[in-house]
């Protein structure tokens, strides 16, 4: 039957043909699988990346597909910018959210702007993600 054959050729997502380059450019977050959702790798862009729970009509930069209701629709923000040396700097802040944003299990204060590095562990609601910084050429 043709059923098995058509399964092999999954339609390619055409909306972002440069996704691989895009991921490298400014890094990404890896959302850890939990009871509320599956593992997801979501690219970051330059500037403010608003991270939160994906839902209809909620236009944010990094929507996480999850049923975790303790995650706000706009929960935290990662700012990505280059310093004078051209090195990417990642800064985390709370959006602010109802349940808070945690970096390595420490809660961020409302005014906190915390510089984070590759491998930083961030928890929003009951969901955890890890920062994957972009590969940087050593100058």
Q: Predicted segment positions?
A:
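Intrinsically disordered, low-complexity acidic Ser/Thr-rich regulatory segments
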Residues: 1-67, 79, 83-89, 133-139
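Forkhead-associated
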Residues: 45-128
């Amino acid at each position: 039957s043709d059923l098995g054959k058509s399964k092999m050729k999954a339609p390619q997502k055409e909306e972002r043909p440069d996704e691989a380059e895009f991921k490298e450019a400014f890094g990404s977050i890896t959302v850890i699988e939990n009871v509320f959702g599956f593992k997801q790798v979501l690219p970051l862009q330059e500037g403010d990346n608003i991270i939160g729970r994906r839902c209809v009509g909620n236009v944010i930069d990094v929507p996480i597909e999850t049923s975790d209701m303790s995650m706000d629709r706009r929960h935290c923000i990662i700012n990505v910018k280059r310093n004078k040396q051209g090195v990417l700097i990642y800064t985390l802040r709370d959006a602010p959210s109802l349940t808070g944003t945690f970096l390595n299990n420490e809660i961020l204060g409302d005014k906190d702007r915390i510089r984070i590095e590759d491998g930083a562990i961030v928890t929003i609601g009951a969901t955890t993600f890890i920062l994957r910084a972009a590969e940087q050429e050593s100058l």
